[in-house]
Structures are given as structure tokens and as C-alpha cells.
């Protein structure tokens, strides 16, 4: 086959695997707040394994640690700061509505 008629092929590039967020020396524990807070969203939800890039065992341990910290009041169950902030309300018009 001629080079011009060959089907397009992607060049094989080596990719660099990202390092896991939990090192071998890190202990997954409910008291380790700096580690636990990496795996919680701004709303206070536990992030998924795909987002965290954790193994199944690590994700299970993180989930248990977060739940223990919530029960012991180290972590809030919800983080709804936006709910209590007051925003400027839009003034309502009291006139009759017109249809076009």
C-alpha cells in the first residue's frame, strides 16, 4: 500500500500516570482533617472515586473516615453558606401583564 492511501493512525505517545493523592505514609483517619478535606466538595459532599483518583479500598476508607468525622462533629453534614447569604431582590412590577 502506498503511504498516501494508508488509513490515518495516531502516533503512540507515552502518557505519564498521575501520582495518587494518598501517599503510602498517609493514614486515613477521621482525625486527619487535612487529608479528609481534599475529598469533600465545597457543598460538603463526598467526591466520587473517578474525581478523587483513588482505589476502591482507599475510597471506602475515606468514606468511613468522613462519616465518622461528621458524627463526631468534626465536619459539618452540609456546607450551605450560600443559603443564608442575602442577595438583592428583583423589584416586581405590579402593573397588568401584556401578551404579545
UniProtKB/Swiss-Prot annotation:
Subunit structure: Part of the 30S ribosomal subunit.
Chain positions covered by the region annotation Disordered: 1-23
Residue ranges with Basic residues bias: 1-19
Keywords assigned by UniProt, alphabetized: Chloroplast, Plastid, Ribonucleoprotein, Ribosomal protein, RNA-binding, rRNA-binding
MF terms (GO), sorted A to Z: small ribosomal subunit rRNA binding; structural constituent of ribosome
Protein name: Small ribosomal subunit protein bS18c
Annotated InterPro entries: Ribosomal_bS18, Ribosomal_bS18_CS, Ribosomal_bS18_sf
Keyword Nucleotide-binding: no
Phylogenetic lineage: Eukaryota, Viridiplantae, Streptophyta, Embryophyta, Tracheophyta
One biological process term in Gene Ontology: translation
Amino acid at each position: 500500500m502506498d503511504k498516501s492511501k494508508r488509513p490515518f493512525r495516531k502516533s503512540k505517545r507515552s502518557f505519564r500516570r498521575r501520582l495518587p493523592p494518598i501517599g503510602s505514609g498517609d493514614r486515613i483517619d477521621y482525625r486527619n482533617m487535612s487529608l479528609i478535606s481534599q475529598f469533600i466538595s465545597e457543598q460538603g459532599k463526598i467526591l466520587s472515586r473517578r474525581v478523587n483518583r483513588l482505589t476502591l479500598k482507599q475510597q471506602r476508607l475515606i468514606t468511613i473516615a468522613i462519616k465518622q468525622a461528621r458524627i463526631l462533629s468534626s465536619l459539618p453534614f452540609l456546607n450551605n453558606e450560600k443559603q443564608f447569604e442575602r442577595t438583592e431582590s428583583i423589584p416586581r412590577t405590579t402593573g397588568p401583564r401584556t401578551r404579545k
